[in-house]
């Protein structure tokens, strides 16, 4: 009798393949919208094993607390401003309609008050290109140009953690602990490298499926691997 495929084990929903909420200190989002400008202080920079970016724990003068992805150059004790009259300096949070053109921003809201949805990965930033009525035009890290409402908030600066990939892993054990904080399977073994009992492509004294890898969309779960319901495979003929 064969063994279950990884996709079948993942579908079961066991803890190995689920996100680990206890690793996340808190949601990284802006506080609710307010018409006034508030000052806050960065009380700590928190390591979040569930993401590649450190979080900045900020306490406002009215007592509210929140976490956001830290900006490059942000430090403990830094005073930040949040609101429509905040200055456009590194770490401050203000509506994109009040940010000068050419400024680098991150953690941008798509709708005012949603807490920040765009440009949150390490080392990324967007650029304010201009205005179009009640919309602000921004260029995302991918190069795509997008319009967001002028009231949508963003943080001035670049997301911290840009040098994450510069440190080599050196050994497989480091990669093991790196991926243990994520709901991923590591290492990822190819089907042709498995035994026949573990995968439809496994077995034999060769690493080849030995049969076409296209499979019907209606195939049973233990067989549904490879090119699922593929219209064509390989390079397109000219």
From Swiss-Prot:
Under the heading InterPro entries, the entry gives:
NA-bd_OB-fold (IPR012340), Rib_uL2_dom2 (IPR014722), Ribosomal_uL2 (IPR002171), Ribosomal_uL2_arc_euk (IPR023672), Ribosomal_uL2_C (IPR022669), Ribosomal_uL2_dom3 (IPR014726), Ribosomal_uL2_RNA-bd_dom (IPR022666), Translation_prot_SH3-like_sf (IPR008991)
Listed Polar residues bias regions: 206-217
Q: Which SMART domains does the UniProt entry name for this protein?
A: Ribosomal_L2, Ribosomal_L2_C
Picking any one GO biological process from the record gives: cytoplasmic translation
Cellular compartments per GO CC: cytosolic large ribosomal subunit
Keyword terms of this UniProt record: Ribonucleoprotein, Ribosomal protein, RNA-binding, rRNA-binding
A GO molecular-function term, please?
structural constituent of ribosome
- Which SUPFAM superfamilies does the record match to this protein? Nucleic acid-binding proteins, Translation proteins SH3-like domain
Region: Disordered, residue numbers: 198-238
Q: What is the role of this chain?
A: One of the primary rRNA binding proteins. Required for association of the 30S and 50S subunits to form the 70S ribosome, for tRNA binding and peptide bond formation. It has been suggested to have peptidyltransferase activity; this is somewhat controversial. Makes several contacts with the 16S rRNA in the 70S ribosome.
Quaternary structure per UniProt?
Part of the 50S ribosomal subunit. Forms a bridge to the 30S subunit in the 70S ribosome.
* Family to which the UniProt record says this protein belongs: Belongs to the universal ribosomal protein uL2 family.
- The protein here is known as Large ribosomal subunit protein uL2
Q: Which organism is it from?
A: Hyperthermus butylicus (strain DSM 5456 / JCM 9403 / PLM1-5)
Gene symbol here is: rpl2
């Amino acid at each position: 009798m064969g063994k279950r495929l990884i996709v079948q084990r993942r579908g079961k929903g066991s803890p190995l393949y689920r996100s680990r909420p206890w690793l996340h200190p808190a949601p990284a989002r802006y506080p609710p919208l307010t018409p006034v400008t508030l000052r806050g202080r960065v009380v700590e920079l928190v390591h979040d094993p569930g993401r590649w970016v450190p979080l900045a724990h900020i306490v406002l003068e009215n007592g509210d607390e929140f976490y956001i992805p830290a900006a490059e150059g942000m430090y403990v004790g830094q005073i930040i401003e949040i609101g429509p009259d905040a200055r456009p300096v590194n770490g401050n949070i203000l509506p994109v309609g009040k940010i000068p053109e050419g400024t680098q921003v991150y953690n941008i809201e798509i709708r005012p008050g949603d807490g920040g949805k765009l440009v949150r990965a390490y080392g990324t930033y967007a650029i304010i290109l201009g205005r179009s009525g009640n919309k602000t035009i921004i260029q995302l890290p991918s190069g795509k140009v997008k319009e967001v409402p002028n009231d949508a908030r963003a943080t001035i600066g670049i997301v911290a953690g840009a040098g994450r990939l510069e440190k080599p892993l050196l050994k497989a054990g480091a990669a093991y602990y790196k991926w243990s904080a994520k709901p991923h399977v590591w290492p990822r073994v190819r089907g042709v490298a498995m035994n026949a009992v573990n995968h439809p492509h496994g077995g034999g004294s060769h690493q080849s499926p030995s049969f076409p890898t296209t499979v019907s969309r209606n195939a049973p779960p233990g067989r549904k691997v490879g090119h699922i319901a593929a219209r064509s495979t390989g390079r397109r003929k000219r």
